[in-house]
Every structure is written in structure tokens, then in C-alpha cells.
Amino acid sequence: MVVDCHIHMALDGGYWKDALARHKEAPDEQFIRKTLETYKSLGFTYLRDGGDRWDAGKRASELAPEYGLCYRTPLFPIYRKGHYGSFIGRGFETLNDFRALVSEVKARGGHFIKIMISGLMDFNRYGVLTDEPMPGALIRELTNIAHGEGFSIMAHANGDAAVRGAILAGIDSVEHGAYLTDETLQMLAESKTVWVPTLVTIGNLIGDARFPEEATRPLLAYQMAAVRKAADFGALIAPGSDAGAYRVFHGQGGLDELALLRRALGDAADEILARGTAEIEARF
């Protein structure tokens, strides 16, 4: 039994614009079925999608029982207009806008809420993020709205400020979590927030000429050390690959992520990851 707590059915591990184009008229059911069959053949039992605004993840969730898979989706990620997330999500400007999107997720059968509260890791420049973090007060407002509607929350979050904001707001899981300090890792361990580090999004870039290894190698080393520290502190950690991201292929990406987490966590890896996975499955 294998799980992947962060995938994107709308993407395919190649160029994102080409991948999304196949779903823009309607979700590409042939692609979705082939991908679900891949997961089934590799022994996966649980998948959690990060969402897309073309309903590829939604269609996958409808088809997944045919393949013996539990598949959870937020329908689409929600981002603050003017900040990261426009390529795949739905945007809001006001809290009323956000409430309306949450209501839409509920009405259309989404399983949880996904929000974007930071930028990306800059894979060309070590130590750099591509956008400012969402203010902590706004993160709390969004969390209260979503929790008030009975939803758990998955948050794309990089950097200390965004992840601390997520922890303090009571967000259920944080994805990626680049460049966290020991203090933030300790906060994570003292909270109920689950960290899904998506190490393979970095690891699978090493050896690719697109990004300089003087950026990707130290970034992977930093993240693997942070995962080890977080586990030592007692944090909840779960495996998620961000499958569909560049060079993270469906199915194999989840196995690659598990291999990196086992390298980082050592002999206790499976026990540590089982704790985090149980929390994800229970809440999402």
C-alpha cells in the first residue's frame, strides 16, 4: 500500500502549458484513466490532488473507485489575485470572494480547501522565493472561513513567514515548506499541522541542465536536513510528490519521494510517515 498526498492530475511532468491544454475543453478522460491505472499498478491506494480549474482532478476523483483508489480533491486551488497561483487556480480579492469560492467547492462536492500563501522556490537561485508571503492575519481569516464550513485546509507554503502563519492559523497541512528554520520546525512539531515536503520536486531537477546544480543540490540538502530535524522534534510528516510538476511523473514520482524521505529519515521512516499519513487520511 502506497500513498501520494500531493499530486496534480491536470499536469504530467512535462511542460505545464502543454499539459493543461489537454483539459481546457474538457478533462481528458483517456489521460486520466491511464494515469489512474498507473497508480493502481504500482500499489497506490490513496491520492490527494492539489486541484486545477479545469476539473481534471474532479473527474479523476469520480473515476478513482473503479481503480480501487481513494482520491481526494479541493476541485481548484485558491490564490490571492496578484500573487502566485493564477496558472492553475481561482483567484480572490476580498473575503467575500473567498467565501463564494468555498461555497462553490462545497456545492460541487470538493473534499477540502487548497490555498496558496507564498511563492515558489526559485530553482535558479538558492535561498530565494518568488513571491512575498500572505500576511498572517489574512491566513487566519481564510482558515476560519474554510474551517467554519467544515473543510480541512491544504496550503502551498514556502518560507518561515508563510509556514508560521499557517501553523498559527491551524491549517491542516503545509506543502513544500522551503527554507524553514529550527524555530519554525519546532513550532510545527508542537502543532497538529502535517508537513508534506515534496522533496522530489527538487531531487528530480538534479542532473537537468535547465537549473544550475549550485542551486538545486544545496536546496535538496537543506530540505532533507530539515525533514530529519522536524521528525526528531516530533512533527507530523507525510509523503507527497507534487506529481505532475516538472520531471515528477505520476506514480514514479511518488516512489521517488518515498525514497528521498527514507534517505532523510533513516530506519524510522516508515513509522514516521505512517503517523503523518494517518492524519492526512483522517482529515482529508
Annotate each predicted stretch with a short phrase.
Residues 2-63, 82-85:
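Metal-associated gating/positioning segment near the N- to mid-region
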Residues 8-12, 49, 53-57, 79-80, ...:
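Active-site environment of divalent metal-dependent phosphoester hydrolases
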Residues 10-27, 81-92, 124-132, 206-215:
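Acidic/histidine-rich helix-loop elements
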Residues 13-18, 163-169, 201-213, 223, ...:
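Histidine/acidic-residue-rich catalytic or RNA/ligand-binding cores of hydrolases
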Residues 29-58, 68-78, 110-124, 152, ...:
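Divalent metal-dependent hydrolysis catalytic cores, especially in the metallo-beta-lactamase
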Residues 30, 52, 90-100:
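Glycine-rich anion/phosphate-binding loops
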Residues 96-116, 121-195, 217-237, 271:
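Histidine/acidic residue-rich metal-binding segments in metalloenzymes
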Residues 148, 221-284:
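His/Asp/Glu-enriched, well-ordered alpha-helical/loop segment
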